[in-house]
């Protein structure tokens, strides 16, 4: 996939991205990230359409293309993803997966915007009505790891969002937060979010109780019976 994106010209990438063959479509879609800065409007419109493709490999190709765009121009990618965050679940999933790549989150300012986008997407997840559809499940799964990638890059900025969503009564949002907190990269933030347990002082030794003296047995008194003469 990477080789095709690097070697193929833009015409071939366009053709591949529209192919009925899933692998060719994956390669062409992923490679369009190289063309995006030269033809931004056309490419981003097409990628947004492909983000909702029924084939999961093509949808994955969109995320790869977005990451490639981000490596060239993170401000351009962020501007587009703010728009995608208001789209349907498949497109939102592409935005989250495209942004939450560790090497794209080296600057705090970028990560702060990514957290804002994830917050918007999570808000729409909590308001979803039909949760049995595939697009909802795909978005839920992506959010189950994307938050932790962004949070690991900027834990202090992420903490208020986690505190907010950890208090949600929505079962799917609760799963998303729990899944992210279970990641090894979340160890530091997980400790901050855990309720602190009060320290227990050392128990003072109980004073030894003195044994009570046993009561002395009373001496029996003999009663004499007088005999009448």
Where are the predicted features?
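Alpha-helical scaffold domains
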Residues: 1-216, 226-229
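Long, intrinsically disordered low-complexity tandem-repeat segments
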Residues: 221-225
